[in-house]
């Protein structure tokens, strides 16, 4: 005895089989893609950039001032956020696909370096940091600024 299956159920079964096939194909592709990335052992490229490493050192240096000196809360906040944004914008800019996007992030990053120097200059004028501390940080910032300028210029060329 043969049971008659209503047409709507047949369509649902066909769609389910089609979805399972697509799902299986996607799973195979996804597994293959993961396997390929695992075999390459990719690292985030920005972590290899000397400017990123130097920015982290600069951020740590400014962080020690924030932690060791008696700054007003707004000074602590502004210096911490600005020096941290240097590190973050280098990373984020490096992840952009177009040259103009990367360039814009590095321009913003360089502006943050300038902002940090101005904060440090005010702290020096208010005798919160010494001339030696200021010069040390200013030298680090100058190096960051020069590297970023070269990166910006390179990305600006056709």
Segments predicted by a language model, with ranges:
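Amphipathic alpha-helical assembly/interaction segments
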Residues: 3-158
